[in-house]
From Swiss-Prot:
Protein name, per record: Large ribosomal subunit protein bL17
InterPro entries referenced in this protein's UniProt entry, alphabetically: Ribosomal_bL17, Ribosomal_bL17_CS, Ribosomal_bL17_sf
Molecular-function GO terms, alphabetical: structural constituent of ribosome
Organism: Thioalkalivibrio sulfidiphilus (strain HL-EbGR7)
Alphabetical UniProt keywords: Ribonucleoprotein, Ribosomal protein
Entry similarity comment: Belongs to the bacterial ribosomal protein bL17 family.
SUPFAM superfamilies linked to this entry: Prokaryotic ribosomal protein L17
Amino acid sequence: MRHRNSGRQLSRNSAHRKATLQNMTASLFRHEVIKTTLPKAKELRRVAEPLITLAKVDNVHKRRVAFARLRDKEMVGKLFQELGPRYQTRPGGYMRILKCGNRPGDNAPMAFVELVDRPELTEEAPAVESAKEE
């Protein structure tokens, strides 16, 4: 019986599952949007959102706790310098999971995971001068 056993196994043993979620969390913080399967996305939310909440207050202890969970020095820096201050006034719900159809090979449900309130990359089109203006 699996009474009171929360979380998903994701067809992995505990060490593999922990490493997978650590890597996915670091990738999410690095790129701010990733594509993965729906069960992994839902499980990722349980790992990544508490880290962002932790990063709202920057001190040495919280950085060490975040490093123990992420094991990526660069992403811990980004978490506390960029993501923590960005979500200072938001009381949770830092991620959005958008379903995006099924994977062609095995028909697994896929999803985009993105951080809300992320700065949009606006590439301005190069100014095209028309021939009439000349």
